[in-house]
Amino acid sequence: TAEETMAEVEKLAEQGLVATFPMKKDIYLMHASYRDKVADDMVAYLEDFHKKNPYRLGSRKAELRVRFLSKLKQNVFDEFMQRLEDTGRIKRSGEFICEGGYEIPHDEVYKQFESALTAMLDKAGFEFIRLADIQLPGIQPAMAEDLLQLLAAEGKVVLLSDDLITLPKYTDMVAEKAREILAAEGKISIAMIRDMIGT
């Protein structure tokens, strides 16, 4: 019967032989040794990922699902990841997952990129810069993209679209001036904003 089966499942769970994932309608089971192997493989993958991509926030959650648990339903996978995060073996940053102890290096490469990009964006003012326009010696395009995403996540730059970049102080100035015009005029247009910033 269903009751007898559940009693046996509970015994196995108490013994640590299976992991249970109770959802709204069903309970999903995973053998504990399989759960541990997947967790170990995932953490090893993330450690290798960080060596190859030191400035990325982590691997995308969807990529990990496809790579390690593609047959698992999304809600069960989410619960698996939450439990793994609760153990401290991984941590999340939005849609990105990294190894639990990983910290992105704020080393010389990071500092030089941040400094050079800030200078470029300051010089550009309200003439926003495109990612393709950023060419710094010794920085490969893929690494520049990673560093840019990192600076955006840290709030040091603003990504206005897929490829337009500026500093937060410029978006803040535009927002403040737009509020002033809106308060004075009762309306605002794109043309008014362009006139206001001189573009």
Residue positions per predicted region:
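C-terminal non-catalytic scaffold/interaction domains in large multidomain proteins
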Residues: T1-T199
